[in-house]
Amino acid sequence: MPEDRKPPAQIRQFDHREFGVPRLLEHKESTLVSVCLPARNEGLTVGPIVATLRTELLLTGVVDEILVIDDHSTDNTAAVAREAGARVVSAADILPEYGGGFGKGEVLWKSLYVAEGDVIVWCDADISQFGSRFVSGILGPLLCESDVDLAKGFYRRPERDREGGGRVTELVARPLLSLFCPELAELHQPLSGEYGGKRAVLEQL
């Protein structure tokens, strides 16, 4: 191995079935957990997602906050999310002194400013077959494994999307990571919208 080649990153793999509610609560203790949903014109899907998170994770005590960051939606995203039980914040109202940009990247860094959690999990707001496992599978390693600071989800796509999904990941993202950051080559879906981390680490990135 060339001397300038970085050592492999410590990437570990977990399964959401390892992290049921009892185990998550056992390790959570006083840790505050926020789930953040960046959303733009997701009025059709954000409601069921928030409702599921509220019933299965918020009311059970695993999650302390469900936060929807509304990115200049022109539909009823904000109203639907609020009615389902989320705290809704407009991206335009967060740190306006730094400019009012658009897009997911803008929402992600701003959400770190308004989220209350010590651990923050982000999840896409357009998932049509959502289950709380999308969040608990990411949250589990962050709560139960002391040496895990960042977690990123991957999953099998629905059969109907097999031919049309994941092309950017397989043809662009993963080859580029393998070329320029080979220590991250093991990431299955580097562009997936489900990931999380500990605030102490995220604020340094």
Language-model features: locations:
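The conserved acidic donor/metal-binding loop of glycosyltransferases
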Residues: D124-F130
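Conserved donor nucleotide-binding strand/loop of the catalytic core
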Residues: D64, A78-W109, V114
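Short, acidic, metal-binding catalytic loop of nucleotide-sugar glycosyltransferases
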Residues: A51-V63
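Short aromatic/hydrophobic "clamp" motif used to bind/position activated sugar donors
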Residues: I120
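N-proximal low-complexity "stem/linker" segments adjacent to membrane-targeting elements
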Residues: M1-T52
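Acceptor/aglycone-binding surface of glycosyltransferases and processive sugar-polymer synthases
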Residues: P96-K110, F130-V201
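A conserved acidic beta->alpha catalytic loop
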Residues: D70-A79
